[in-house]
């Protein structure tokens, strides 16, 4: 991921000496982010990759401080948080392809924060339609040939992933796509239905069933997030009536990736 950021945006990530910058857990690694062109300081990146007792599940990105200049230059403090499993007994740490794509996804959010430049932090921000685009688009680089040849190697032989296997993985990307699309889209539509009610429903389960019935939801497919555990909607207002942005972002990131591929260089800095 750091290699990708360097090629696309000219960022360097340098480990900060242990203990020189406070972290919120011993597992957290801190990196200083600088511009390759002039060595100027961009911010700090906190990498919290491993699961532990008391840590919430899933993966997420956090911006503790955004860039601003209204009261002197304030640089970015950003973190990525994953739940990878630590290896035991000196074994190498292995992650799945899905984990690797998640890592690049969350790193895209961090790159978005690190690239932002505005005077007043209160006037910064991202339209909900766009907020998942910077994360989802960076997932495409996981299977790019330079990343595969440099980093995605067999743990025992050191050989990079063969292109024949990459082709099969990419071909499998459309498997069950109809199911996945309906699962995602039903969650987005029920979200919109819920947030356009003049009177909030008191029986959320009954509302969900009625909403899905109006949509003609196939019985064989379930929502990606049932309403009782739809954290995107209820842990904050961030995604209220906005869960559709994940699907809309897929449209934008597919178009972007096609543009990179058509240029003949998926690390084309002029496009980035």
For the regions a language model picked out, list residue spans one by one.
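Cation-handling catalytic/transport regions enriched in His/Asp/Glu
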Residues: 1-272
């Amino acid at each position: 991921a750091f290699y990708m950021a360097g090629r696309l945006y000219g960022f360097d990530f340098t480990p900060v000496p242990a203990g020189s910058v406070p972290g919120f857990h011993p597992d957290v690694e801190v990196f200083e982010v600088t511009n390759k062109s002039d060595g100027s300081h961009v911010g700090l990146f906190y990498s919290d990759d491993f699961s532990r007792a008391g840590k919430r599940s899933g993966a997420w990105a956090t911006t503790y401080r955004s860039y601003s200049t209204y009261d002197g230059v304030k640089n970015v403090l950003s973190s990525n948080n994953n739940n990878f499993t630590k290896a035991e007994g000196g074994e190498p740490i292995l992650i799945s392809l899905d984990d690797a794509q998640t890592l690049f996804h969350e790193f895209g959010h961090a790159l978005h924060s690190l690239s932002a430049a505005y005077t007043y932090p209160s006037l910064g921000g991202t339209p909900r339609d766009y907020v998942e685009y910077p994360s989802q688009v960076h997932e495409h680089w996981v299977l790019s040939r330079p990343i595969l040849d440099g980093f995605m190697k067999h743990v025992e032989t050191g050989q990079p992933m063969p292109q024949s296997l990459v082709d099969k993985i990419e071909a499998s990307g459309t498997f069950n796509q109809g199911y996945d699309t309906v699962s995602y889209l039903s969650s987005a539509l029920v979200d919109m239905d819920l947030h356009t009610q003049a009177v909030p429903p008191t029986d959320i389960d009954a509302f969900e069933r009625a909403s899905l019935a109006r949509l003609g939801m196939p019985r064989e497919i379930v929502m990606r997030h049932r309403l009782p555990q739809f954290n995107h909607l209820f842990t904050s207002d961030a995604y209220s009536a906005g869960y559709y942005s994940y699907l809309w972002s897929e449209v934008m990131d597919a178009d972007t990736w096609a543009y990179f591929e058509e240029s003949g260089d998926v690390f084309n800095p002029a496009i980035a």
